[in-house]
Amino acid sequence: MARNIPLERVRNIGIAAHIDAGKTTTTERILFYSGVIHKIGEVHEGNTVTDWMAQERERGITITAAAITTAWTRRDPENPTQPLPGALEHKINIIDTPGHVDFTIEVERSMRVLDGVITVLCSVGGVQPQTETVWRQANRYNVPRFIFVNKMDRTGANFYKVYSQVRDRLRANAVPIQLPIGAEDTLSGIVDLVGMKAYVYGNDIGTDIRVEEIPADMEELVQEYRAKLIEAVSETDDVLLEKYFGGEELTEAEIKAALRKGTVANTIVPMLCGSAFKNKGVQQMLDAVLDYLPSPLDIPPIKGLLPNGTEVERSADDSQPLSALAFKIMADPYGRLTFVRVYSGILQKGSYALNASKDKKERISRLIVLKADDRIEVDELRAGDLGAVVGLKDTFTGDTLCTEDSPVILESLFIPEPVISVAIEPKTKADLDKLSKALQSLSEEDPTFRVHVDQETNQTIIAGMGELHLEILVDRMLREFKVEANVGAPQVAYRETIRKAVNNVEGLYKRQTGGKGQYGHVVINLEPGEPGTGFEFVSKIVGGVVPKEYIGPAEQGMKERCESGVIAGYPLIDVKVTMVDGSYHDVDSSEMAFKIAGSLALREAAQKAQPVLLEPMMKVEVEVSGDFLGDVMGDLNARRGQIESMDNEGGVSKVTSRVPLAEMFGYATDIRSKTQGRGTFSMEFSHYEEVPRNVAETIIAKNKGNA
């Protein structure tokens, strides 16, 4: 079957930002103007298309990355409510992502599979902590983007302040290509710095847009920002640079081509403005998606590994062998949905694909594309497409689907570690099986949600990215799986590590009491690893002193010992083990004996290597009026916080600090009472840091039952 729309007219984009910047409203307007919906939904009314989970509609926040397909034809610059005569339709796949830090994995997995991003910023709040997190995630995957400064109709709106923040805090080469005409309740339109026109809105529903001369009182400002635009685009191309230095005018086509080149190369970040809620600037933003964000053909080929470890590239081409990345799992009444991005080749309904990550064959029984909760069945997904496969059994987030005769494994996703855990149990014994099924289903969907059983207490422990994250998952158990659960108090996800290296530590397991005995013997070196490496194992066994079949079990024993640590029962991380020697017995040695020997060696070595306790540190930003600043800072210090910076703007102080997560439980209530309800804060995971000795002693004693 031929492709309906050629790849150069396809855009895979995400809409990402800080919570409350207006992402979901912006998406709704895009869907309205592109004809997917015929009535605009509002977040505050709980009837938006992309927020389709019950909790999303109740809370007014986006939790899961909803994927939607729509289409857009470039507007006529002289008649902006109508398509440009002769312009061709483009297909746009949109992912609306959450802005709440507890759901950061949804942003992470979206960035991994997108070609471009619209970053929505609030014209009042500007760059917020979660904006910086989203920006870093986009940087990690080198995703081209532009900025839409939203809510220009709100009191306190300031486009130029946001422009400065983007350059200073995000260190981005932001280039405004539009300026607002007016602000707050006088917002009446936008100036297009590329076409040098003013678009003035006759109403708040986006159906009456007039093209006018640029207002006389803006002439100087427009010339200043037009000059910045021309300078920025000239630097993308030697020919344009020559024209610029020669004092020649650049044509509109040259400016657009250079802007596209700079945006795709991530050297320019265009800035647009408007008000999604008041329907101002949305059509122009959609034109910018077509003009400046890349098609699948514009991005570099995806890199992967062949089974022998050789690096290979796959480009966006239907004729190449299939390669697709699973980026999201979702439980659904129709069956388990596995969302995929097809990077090359064609994924066909009724065919078989190899899950190269697990080396298992999967049958592709049904393929669908989504319009939020509408599912449209399709026969195939081609290179550059986003869609979902129904009913895959062994494929999870980060796995690669390919053909058996051309296997490849694509780079997976970065999955952050959980920072908070709680014990959970069903309210009635009858619900035990249902709870187990619910936890399995939810952990398959969300790789940052972990479930394990505490070996000592036999309690089921769930771990996640924050209190809201776990609260919503428990809520989903009740709604979707009809399981009522009791949840314990939140616990901090402490970790253990070591501070010095130790060499030649032995682990000997010997049981010889007549008959077949047990014998395993290993010698290891243990040293601190790089932060974030977890557990690293190297074997330097030579000459067969330990047979190959026993090295794996010894490593497994060490890994399992790391899971329960050596000082307080928390996982031991960022260690490098080198197995240097050992011995075996022809009759008595076994895999189990070497597994136990490995565990004994690791425990002995870690106890000698100056083990320490680590705790998650959170980046906390508090905004408060000056009257309460002293109380807030005193409180942060009392919570073992480290104040990093303070800014004051318009009578509001912003305090940035790093505070241990253990000290932040209940902070939302405390700050409300300390500031009479006028203080706000945001918190996100920063890093792990060593726990002060006096605090560590209390935690260790408590875990040993001595507290």
Curated annotation (Swiss-Prot):
It comes from the Bacteria. GTP binds at residues 17-24, 96-100, 150-153. Pfam families: EFG_C, EFG_III, EFG_IV, GTP_EFTU, GTP_EFTU_D2. GO terms for molecular function: GTP binding; GTPase activity; translation elongation factor activity. The gene is fusA. The keyword Nucleotide-binding applies. Catalyzes the GTP-dependent ribosomal translocation step during translation elongation. During this step, the ribosome changes from the pre-translocational (PRE) to the post-translocational (POST) state as the newly formed A-site-bound peptidyl-tRNA and P-site-bound deacylated tRNA move to the P and E sites, respectively. Catalyzes the coordinated movement of the two tRNA molecules, the mRNA and conformational changes in the ribosome. Belongs to the TRAFAC class translation factor GTPase superfamily. Classic translation factor GTPase family. EF-G/EF-2 subfamily. It comes from Gloeobacter violaceus (strain ATCC 29082 / PCC 7421). It is found in: Cytoplasm. Residues 8-297 form the tr-type G domain. GO terms for biological process: ribosome disassembly. This is Elongation factor G. GO terms for cellular component: cytoplasm. SMART domains: EFG_C, EFG_IV. PROSITE patterns: G_TR_1 (PS00301), G_TR_2 (PS51722). InterPro entries: EFG_II (IPR041095), EFG_III (IPR009022), EFG_III/V (IPR035647), EFG_IV (IPR047872), EFG_V (IPR035649), EFG_V-like (IPR000640), EFTu-like_2 (IPR004161), G_TR_CS (IPR031157). Keywords: Cytoplasm, Elongation factor, GTP-binding, Nucleotide-binding, Protein biosynthesis.
